[in-house]
């Protein structure tokens, strides 16, 4: 009498992680992909500026921060300024 064959599952493939954007739409001039983020990890400051209308913003960052975090802080600061 023979032993039953065991069925082995195929190894799962790792899903590719899409990189996050570093260029965003400007909330002031409404141009697409003109705001560029620069992260200064040594000084813990994130800079974002628009190449068209020259608007800029800077905020404090930490070791977990990504460019999208700087952009969202900028949009939140714009909304607070409009509501105040």
UniProtKB/Swiss-Prot annotation:
Q: Which UniProt keywords apply?
A: Metal-binding, Nucleus, Transcription, Transcription regulation, Zinc, Zinc-finger
Q: Name the Gene3D superfamilies for this protein.
A: 2.20.25.190
What Pfam family does this protein match (any one)?
Zn_ribbon_Elf1
Output one GO BP term. Answer: transcription elongation by RNA polymerase II
- Binding locations of Zn(2+): 26, 29, 50, 53
* Compartments, as annotated in UniProt: Nucleus
What's a GO cellular component annotated to this UniProt protein?
transcription elongation factor complex
Molecular function (Gene Ontology), one example:
zinc ion binding
Q: What does this protein do?
A: Transcription elongation factor implicated in the maintenance of proper chromatin structure in actively transcribed regions.
Q: State the similarity comment.
A: Belongs to the ELOF1 family.
What's the protein name?
Transcription elongation factor 1 homolog
């Amino acid at each position: 009498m023979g032993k039953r064959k065991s069925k082995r599952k195929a190894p799962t493939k790792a899903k590719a992680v899409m990189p996050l954007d570093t260029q965003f739409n400007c909330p002031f001039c409404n141009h697409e992909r003109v705001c560029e983020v620069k992260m200064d990890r040594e000084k813990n400051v994130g800079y974002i500026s628009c190449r068209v209308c020259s608007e800029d913003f800077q905020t404090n960052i930490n070791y977990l921060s990504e460019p999208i975090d700087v952009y969202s802080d900028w949009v939140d600061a714009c909304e607070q300024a409009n509501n105040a």
